[in-house]
Amino acid sequence: MEFGLLGEAEARSPALSLSDAGTPHPPLPEHGCKGQEHSDSEKASASLPGGSPEDGSLKKKQRRQRTHFTSQQLQELEATFQRNRYPDMSTREEIAVWTNLTEARVRVWFKNRRAKWRKRERSQQAELCKGGFAAPLGGLVPPYEEVYPGYTYGNWPPKALAPPLAAKTFPFAFNSVNVGPLASQPVFSPPSSIAASMVPSAAAAPGTVPGPGALQGLGGAPPGLAPAAVSSGAVSCPYASAAAAAAAAASSPYVYRDPCNSSLASLRLKAKQHASFSYPAVPGPPPAANLSPCQYAVERPV
């Protein structure tokens, strides 16, 4: 029976010999067990004093030492940070000498301080965006409130209504003439009332235009007393009579007027006055005293 079993085993695996069949093979180790054996060996080699450099990398990292700054050191660092947020190498070395610190510690402190400053700026901007535009006006940071103590934000006085036109003066037109009575007239009044109220002096005194002094007196006087005040300071104008005639015709509402005839009459009057009006002659250059074109008064040195 044994030979029959061996023959079947040889038929299945011809490379198998009798000696191999007699000695059983040990079981193959699994991958997990193999890795565990390697880790145990590495731990054992790391615990030995004469370990390799690769074993040293597995050691725990050294813990960083936290630097404790004194109040004097923090005061000096903060003062320098307010002046310069990005100090160069030489400045950091000087600060290290003053504060009895290393340059690396000073550099790290400035780096952390800048990060804190940026974070604070971002938080303030986020608060302003959330609160809208009322937040910066209601509560400012202390430096701005110290610089501008007189401004009271959020407590602006209510808008006052603009004064009426009667209270305003126009210095560029009539030397600070009060235009109260003119402004008190209705805006959309009939043409007859406008002509009667605005040109009372021209209807009473044809050919005259009131001067600045007369207009000042006219400001507070009623329309009936206006001609007496205007007659004192009058300046002649060629077109005043036509305007006076038109105003006089417009001021009498009970007389029938033909618009065509009145316009033709006013145009004829304007044409006559324009023809009779002459500008003053401009004095010309003095006549030449028998001098030829080539003679000039040239002063020659003696």
From Swiss-Prot:
Q: Where is this motif: OAR?
A: 262-275
Task: Give the location in the cell.
Answer: Nucleus
Which regions are flagged for Basic and acidic residues bias? 31-43
Q: What keywords appear on the UniProt entry?
A: Activator, Developmental protein, DNA-binding, Homeobox, Nucleus, Phosphoprotein, Transcription, Transcription regulation
Q: What are the GO cellular component annotations?
A: chromatin; nucleus
Q: Say if the entry is tagged with keyword Acetylation.
A: no
Q: In which tissues is it expressed?
A: Expression is restricted to the substantia nigra and ventral tegmental area in the midbrain. Expression increases in prenatally stressed adult offspring in the ventral tegmental area, whereas no changes are observed in the substantia nigra area (at protein level).
**What would be one Pfam family of this protein?**
OAR
Has keyword Phosphoprotein?
yes
Q: Which GO terms describe its molecular function?
A: DNA-binding transcription activator activity, RNA polymerase II-specific; DNA-binding transcription factor activity; DNA-binding transcription factor activity, RNA polymerase II-specific; RNA polymerase II cis-regulatory region sequence-specific DNA binding; sequence-specific double-stranded DNA binding
Q: Where is this motif: Nuclear localization signal?
A: 268-272
Q: Its principal location? A: nucleus
Q: Give coiled-coil spans as residue ranges.
A: none
Q: Outline the segment boundaries, as ranges, of region: Disordered.
A: 1-71
Q: Which family does it belong to?
A: Belongs to the paired homeobox family. Bicoid subfamily.
Give a short account of what the protein does: Transcriptional regulator which is important for the differentiation and maintenance of meso-diencephalic dopaminergic (mdDA) neurons during development. In addition to its importance during development, it also has roles in the long-term survival and maintenance of the mdDA neurons. Activates NR4A2/NURR1-mediated transcription of genes such as SLC6A3, SLC18A2, TH and DRD2 which are essential for development of mdDA neurons.
How it assembles, according to the record, is:
Interacts with SFPQ.
Protein's UniProt name: Pituitary homeobox 3
UniProt organism field: Rattus norvegicus
